[in-house]
Amino acid sequence: MEETIGRGTWIDKLAHELIEREKALGRSTDMINVESGLGASGIPHMGSLGDAVRAYGVGLALGDMGHAFKLIAYSDDLDGLRKVPEGMPSSLEEHIARPVSAIPDPYGCHDSYGMHMSGLLLEGLDALNIEYDFRRARDTYRDGLLSEQIHGILSSSSKIGEKIAEMVGQEKFRSSLPYFAVCGQCGKMYTAEAVEYVADSRKVRYRCADAKVGGKQVAGCGHEGEADIGGAGGKLAWKVEFAARWQAFDVRFEAYGKDIMDSVRINDWVSDEILSNPHPHHARYEMFLDKGGKKISKSSGNVVTPQKWLRYGTPQSILLLMYKRITGARELGLEDVPALMDEYGDLQREYFAGGGRGGKAREAKNRGLFEYANLLVKQAGPRPHAAYRLLVELSRLFKEDRAERVTKKLVEYGVVDGPSPEIERLIGLAGNYADDMYAAERSDIELDEATKGALSELVELLGSAPGDGLQDAIYGIAKSHGVPPRDFFRALYRIILDTPSGPRIGPFIEDIGREKVAGMIRGRL
């Protein structure tokens, strides 16, 4: 029987492998730095968030093993803007090829466009209670924290260029330095071609010429100048920059997405062979895809952001999504919120009630998953919970005094004992989901003449004085018009819920309100 490592999750397995590797390398394990790179050029999405959340999870497992850890959240805000993300102001077009830290924030709330984008991701991490040490590329380069690594890399640029061509077939760095200078005259970086490294003065000579950036031709200004590698006048290319950071920040773990696998392979080689620094332990994860199977992109409009998700779901639902597994591509949309919310509810019930399906290993893994979804913060007991899908359906019915009326139904159903702040919070989230996701025009309903006649009679009945036996009355109306009661009930559910079935129709109409239902029916006649 295979021994359970830690809490039985992939997170624990990775942390265990990391420590074993560090011991084999003879390095101290008193403090382990894990890193996540934050893109600063596009709108941060759930995939961007997942990189940092997973790294933090590995850190938590390290802490569980008795090792101190720190998550370094590194914003690549010296990167240049290659294209304007969908939905962003077109005025950003004039800043194409400029470092995102040098572009004004179009919304005026941060010191730069890059910091605005990074701030959105940090806001998501804060909402999840993820602790991190935030660092900016602009400050890192400006303060010369990578200068020794840059010197070592540029001094070996010919060797690196040959290796890049050998490993991934990219010829570019055989003839140019793996360094992007920022033109001192026009402020653009991808037009400033680095042509020579002067090791004695530690400066990069460049000339600013026309270049293709983000699929478009961008004009250079013709300026020739020098960039000091000890400042923020340029940055290393991705193919080598990770290695510089890993050594400068003593990074021992970094996960990466499948899309940058080649860059990581090259950086591992640069770290090991050029900088003589053993590369970090890695974990490769698959990307989140949109519901059409396309990669979620920072610059396109198919982005599910942490902010959008948290309008409908709890932080625990996001953490569960990230910690369930690390392998396998997954399609992700806001329509997945209900399933994750209910899955967390199931884990909570199993955790405190005991039992569960799948044997001891599966039970241990599920317990561990619940604990990581709460960032290993011990839970005193189960929080009040109700099935999210039920909350959504009830929220669709009750807009006025929603929390009170939905809670009343939950008590009647025996789901909860009474009102509580937690249930009110869940109703608020489910209510947002109901209001936003079902706001589109409802589907058409085909009604024959007999059904229309029965519905008209029901409208008259609902407008009269309330009486007992509404369920039987509806049944009788259907029969009197020659409509099978089952078909009549289905038509009513379609009108009220836009679904083919629902709760017992008579009490259901009384719950919603006779006048309101009558109005719904009139709108379909």
UniProtKB/Swiss-Prot annotation:
Provide the residue positions that the database annotates as binding ATP.
Answer: 298
Domain of life of the organism encoding this protein: Archaea
GO terms (molecular function) for this protein are: ATP binding; lysine-tRNA ligase activity; tRNA binding
> Which reaction does this chain catalyze?
tRNA(Lys) + L-lysine + ATP = L-lysyl-tRNA(Lys) + AMP + diphosphate
Q: Does the keyword Protein biosynthesis apply?
A: yes
Q: Does the keyword ATP-binding apply?
A: yes
Q: What class of enzyme is it?
A: ligase
List cystine links. none
Gene Ontology biological-process annotations? lysyl-tRNA aminoacylation
The cellular component terms of Gene Ontology attached to this UniProt record, alphabetical and capped at eight, are: cytoplasm
Q: Where is the motif 'HIGH' region annotated in this sequence?
A: 40-48
Which residue positions does the secretion signal occupy? Answer: none
Q: What is its EC number?
A: 6.1.1.6
Keywords (A to Z) from UniProt:
Aminoacyl-tRNA synthetase, ATP-binding, Cytoplasm, Ligase, Nucleotide-binding, Protein biosynthesis
Residue ranges annotated as motif 'KMSKS' region: 295-299
Subcellular location per UniProt equals:
Cytoplasm
Instruction: Describe the family membership recorded for this protein in Swiss-Prot or TrEMBL.
Output: Belongs to the class-I aminoacyl-tRNA synthetase family.
- Name the chain's protein: Lysine--tRNA ligase
